[in-house]
């Protein structure tokens, strides 16, 4: 069996609220860590989310 191209990652809020999104990314085309600006409902504003591994 071949190795999967897409992997699941966790986007953790930089506002230190503990909130995170789970998404997937293509590991071949996006080799660097993903960062996105998304809504954090705990902080009730848009903040930067950084990639972390799912344990």
UniProtKB/Swiss-Prot annotation:
Keyword list, A-Z: Ribonucleoprotein, Ribosomal protein
InterPro entries for this protein: Ribosomal_bL33 (IPR001705), Ribosomal_bL33_CS (IPR018264), Ribosomal_bL33_sf (IPR038584), Ribosomal_zn-bd (IPR011332)
Pfam (any one): Ribosomal_L33
Keyword Translocase included in the entry's annotation: no
GO BP of this protein: translation
GO cellular component: cytosolic large ribosomal subunit
SUPFAM superfamilies from the UniProt entry: Zn-binding ribosomal proteins
Coiled coil: none
GO molecular function list: structural constituent of ribosome
Disulfide-bond pairs as recorded: none
Leader peptide range in chain numbering: none
UniProt family annotation: Belongs to the bacterial ribosomal protein bL33 family.
Protein name according to UniProt: Large ribosomal subunit protein bL33
Organism name: Rhodopseudomonas palustris (strain BisB5)
């Amino acid at each position: 069996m071949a190795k999967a191209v897409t992997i699941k990652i966790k986007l953790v809020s930089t506002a230190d609220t503990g909130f995170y999104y789970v998404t997937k990314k293509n590991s071949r085309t996006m080799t660097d860590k993903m960062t996105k600006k998304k809504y954090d409902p705990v902080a009730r504003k848009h903040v930067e989310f950084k990639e972390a591994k799912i344990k």
